[in-house]
Swiss-Prot record:
UniProt keyword list: Disulfide bond, Secreted, Signal, Toxin
The protein's name in its UniProt record: U8-lycotoxin-Ls1g
Coarse class of the protein's main subcellular location: secreted
InterPro entries: Spider_toxin_CSTX_knottin
Organism: Lycosa singoriensis (Wolf spider)
Tissue: Expressed by the venom gland.
Amino acid sequence: MKLIIFTGLVLFAIVSLIEVQADNERACLPQYQVCTDAPGNCCSNLVCNCYGRYKSGARIGRNCFCLQKGVIYKREN
């Protein structure tokens, strides 16, 4: 009985380690990629910045992109 419980715990630990490793290996989003649905997936040197979209003063949506940390983007005329 103890052997069955021990074997079950060992298998559980192995499966847990495999899942954690798979999460750590997930690809990060590179610069300028859309991160609206996954704000935490930008690569380490990037941050997910979101901007509202407006038409005639009414908000019509939101866009989020992986951009460099500390960089300010301004609209050019």
